Amino acid sequence: MPSIEAVGAREILDSRGNPTVEVEVVLEDGTLGRAAVPSGASTGAFEAVELRDGGDRYGGKGVTKAVEAVIGRIGPAIMELEATEQRLLDATLIDLDGTPGKSALGANALLGVSLAVAKAAAASSGLPLFRYLGGPSAHLLPVPMMNILNGGAHADTNVDIQEFMIAPIGAGTFAESLRWGAEIYQALKSVLKGRGLATGVGDEGGFAPSLPTNREALDLIAEAIDKAGFGLGDDIALALDVASTEFFADGSYTFEGSGRSAEQMIDYYADLVDSYPIVSIEDPLAEDDWAGWTSITTRLGARVQLVGDDLFVTNPERLARGIAEGAANALLVKVNQIGTLTETLDAVNLAHRSGYRCMMSHRSGETEDTTIADLAVAVDCGQIKTGAPARSERVAKYNQLLRIEEELDDAARYAGAGAFPRRTTTG
């Protein structure tokens, strides 16, 4: 297999107008791999650390230090490594950084290199990325968890829950699921206009109206599903990303204007699950509220998927603790939370071995890079979260999944309702 011959990097812009890192790796056979690194708005305290410049330039968010780290430190250290030696490459990156949170060189620098090398190796092998990473059996297309209504840190409104998602579980193919989602998205816009509500969009393409309660958001989505001609529950399920760490402080959750305990939050979620066909709730409790997580998993874990994002930060060590303590039953997978492809794959493998579901995810600050679409198929996630069917940095991932489904042809399988074995018919 060709070895690494050249490594370059540059500062580019993400979908929120903030700088991010793009890395290019060239192999000795001339093959090029390019990867751009995403960035989050609501970030977990235990995520790997992005290296930012500080100062006045780009409001302190420049990434020239990370670019310099790629060119000056990382590139020389990995030159002549074989591109297929992903685990060795990533171990070299981790050792070179030498800090637990990857703060010396920056997780944004390390991840860009890690992904660019994988893409170069795939191209050199003559394989699409999903096939190179997943092998000959990779064929499962994920259910798109479309964030069509935004609140929380993704929108400047008084809606506490960060993401209200639709899951087209009744579709027969990924292409059909995407069409259903797009039709519901347009129907929701019409419903909002009819109510005199704002139709501006948040970071991830979902609408961001100011609403009196979080339930109102669910009711508007239910109306849009009906308006588009689909059935709530059988055709389209609902999902939430609460991002509750964002409103947790001093042991209390400030939610809909009042302080609530973990048990009161769990009561609230139980009522929602009783009232709506909700198949997944992400980060219902805060990243350090382990007791609360164990409690909600005991109470609701048999009925609904409980996804750890800030709780696990795609970190195998934190996931192992959650498995041991019975906290959550699914892992959100964000490659930039951990900083290398190998560590991401290790977290996914641990989740699968332990009976935890996995949901591949974008970040609120995205680029046109489509790596996560291939990765979702490669590791049999069965679920992907990459925003509304709008904004080109979101649609890029969906379009890549369309291409993958077309390439797989008769071998392609759409995960559908099977991605949510805990699903009930409530709603």
From Swiss-Prot:
Its EC number is 4.2.1.11. One of its GO terms (biological process) is glycolytic process. It holds the Pfam family Enolase_N. The active site is at E204 (proton donor), K334 (proton acceptor). (2R)-2-phosphoglycerate binds at Q162, K334, R363, S364, K385. Its main location: cytoplasm. Pathway: Carbohydrate degradation; glycolysis; pyruvate from D-glyceraldehyde 3-phosphate: step 4/5. Mg(2+) binds at D241, E282, D309. Gene3D superfamilies: Enolase-like C-terminal domain, Enolase-like, N-terminal domain. Binds a second Mg(2+) ion via substrate during catalysis. One of its GO terms (molecular function) is phosphopyruvate hydratase activity. SUPFAM superfamilies: Enolase C-terminal domain-like, Enolase N-terminal domain-like. InterPro entries: Enolase, Enolase-like_C_sf, Enolase-like_N, Enolase_C, Enolase_CS, Enolase_N. It catalyses: (2R)-2-phosphoglycerate = phosphoenolpyruvate + H2O. It is found in: Cytoplasm; Secreted; Cell surface. GO terms for cellular component: cell surface; extracellular region; phosphopyruvate hydratase complex. Its cofactor is Mg(2+). Keywords: Cytoplasm, Glycolysis, Lyase, Magnesium, Metal-binding, Secreted. Catalyzes the reversible conversion of 2-phosphoglycerate (2-PG) into phosphoenolpyruvate (PEP). It is essential for the degradation of carbohydrates via glycolysis. Belongs to the enolase family. PANTHER family: ENOLASE (PTHR11902:SF1). This is Enolase. It comes from Parafrankia sp. (strain EAN1pec).
